Amino acid sequence: MLDVIVLDDKQKELDNDDAKLVKKVLAFAFDFMQLKQNYEMSVNFVNDEKIHQINKEYRNTDRATDVISFALEESDRIHIDGVAEELGDLFISLDHAHAQAEEYLHSYNRELAYLAVHGFLHLLGYDHTRSQAAEDEMFGLQDKILEGYGLTK
C-alpha cells in the first residue's frame, strides 16, 4: 500500500481534483511496479516562486523547476513491521505543470501525473541523470505507467 498526503504551500492537506489525481496515479504506479513494502510519502503543491526558493536553498540551482524530490536515505528510514516506510517528499510546481502542458501539447492532468510519477521514481532510487541507460529505463517506465493509467501524450 502507498499512503500519499497532498499538501498545499501552507502545509494544509488538500482533497481537490489535483490531489485526487496524484493519489490515484501514484497508487496505480505502486501496483504497476508490484511493490511489496508499505510506503508513505508527501506531495507538496507549490508555485514557481516557492520551488525556486527550494531549488536554490537545497540544490544550489537558482531557477524554478517542475518537480523536486527529497528521498530519505535507506539508512535514515525506520523499519517497523506493519508500519508504512517513509519514502520522502515531492514538491511540484503547479505553475510549471500548466506551462509544460501547453508547451508539450497535452493535458494538464497528464503533465501533473507525469511529474508525480517522475518524482515517485526518484524517491524509489531511479536517477535519469546517471547514464543514458538509466534515463531510458526511467522514462520508459514513466511512459508505461502513464499509458497503463490511461494518460497518453
UniProtKB/Swiss-Prot annotation:
Cofactor: binding details: Binds 1 zinc ion.
Domain of life, per lineage: Bacteria
Protein's cellular compartments: Cytoplasm
Reported cofactor(s): Zn(2+)
Positions bound to Zn(2+): 118, 122, 128
Broad class of where this protein is predominantly found: cytoplasm
One Pfam family hit: YbeY
Keyword list, A-Z: Cytoplasm, Endonuclease, Hydrolase, Metal-binding, Nuclease, Ribosome biogenesis, rRNA processing, Zinc
Role description: Single strand-specific metallo-endoribonuclease involved in late-stage 70S ribosome quality control and in maturation of the 3' terminus of the 16S rRNA.
Family per similarity comment: Belongs to the endoribonuclease YbeY family.
HAMAP family linked: Endoribonucl_YbeY (MF_00009)
Protein name (record): Endoribonuclease YbeY
Name of the gene: ybeY
